[in-house]
Amino acid sequence: MQRIRCLLALFALEATGFAGPASAVAQNPADDWRPRTLPLYGVSYSPEVGLLLGAGLVHTRYAFRALPPSTRLTAAAAYATGARTYRITLAGEFRRPLAPATVAVDLYASGLEIVRYYGLGNATVASGPDSVYQVRQTQFAIAPTLSVPLAARLRLAAGVMVKHARTHADSGTLLFAAGPAYGSGFGAAGVRTLLELDTRDHPTAATSGLHLVIAAQWYPALWDAVRPFGSLSAEAATYASTGDPPRATLALRAGLAGVSGTVPFHELVYIGGGTTVRGYPEQRFAGRSGAYANAELRLRVGWLSVGDVGVLGLADAGRVWGEDDASRRWHAAGGGGLWFALRHRRASTVSVTWARGTEHPALYVRVGFMF
């Protein structure tokens, strides 16, 4: 669950997403349909990752006076000062005029997917120094996908995933002592599918709507996978607000996931950190299945000339299940924070949150909200 999301979000200067030309057609109708290239930039912070700085470019091209765009190309790179590693992503989306399907190709090289390993189970301890639990792993992946709309705001996507992970054998770490059966490198190729319903009014700072994602992956016994393995996950988030523009927003989210087969350690279900249960280290708990829930109450308390100012309260909980795991404990955390929307634009929202679990408090800074 944690691996499919990144704390770093990227802004496009003067535009976010597929920038449509409708607002300026009357002034410059010819210019609005020309190809455009915009810079991207982003920043976030979490304890184990550190300061994550990112930049990139997004190029958008339209067919003859047709929306949505026919081509969108994105290139981005980020570096984490705490984890001392990087993530590079290349993505392309391609559409033919009047055709409903979208072809996407995603490539990435990343050392940020897995940064900690505390062992398998819901009751693992973290009494040693932090260096014992650190993981240095670089993942390389390519994933072509075909996406088809089933209804308004509902899409089905399917494709293949080719992935290789290289793990450094750092002596003195818990992972080195456990000794992954496959050694330092693991390659696999499989298929994946995703069903997504998205009625949110904004992707990173929603105030209304529903977001539901159900995803599955399966890898046959090919390459370094001696036996088949797979995963299934589901996540749902909903939002309710009062006022126009919204003065208060209640955001709720729940998710669960499970794996089967002979799974490499980096494909386990992980709970903890800035994308699942805040107030715990990244990948604090690992298991063959897991669940989490989050709640945030976001209040707008100030309307300044430069933007909106707000506060929020949060509560998170989650757990994993391992083999013969007798623990019944749910790991919970609570906290709060501030948020600011520059120029009253939700696309320019930055949030700063503080959360405390049972081990130590943690500070998070990100573009938008966690969900």
Label every PLM stretch briefly.
Residues 76-78, 127-132, 176-182, 218-224, ...:
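Extracellular loop and loop/strand-boundary signature of outer-membrane beta-barrel proteins
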Residues 78-90, 96-142, 255-274, 348-354, ...:
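Outer-membrane beta-barrel translocator/channel fold
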Residues 241-322:
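Extracytoplasmic gating/loop element in the C-terminal half of outer-membrane beta-barrel translocons
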Residues 24-115, 155-157, 167, 180-207, ...:
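Outer-membrane beta-barrel initiation region
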Residues 39-41, 73-77, 103-107, 156-160, ...:
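Membrane-embedded beta-strand positions of outer-membrane beta-barrel proteins
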Residues 192-195, 336-340, 345, 360-371:
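Outer-membrane beta-barrel "beta-signal"
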Residues 68-70, 87-90, 115-123, 168-175, ...:
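Outer-membrane beta-barrel translocator domains and adjoining extracellular loop/strand segments
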Residues 45, 129-163, 184, 197, ...:
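Outer-membrane beta-barrel transmembrane strands
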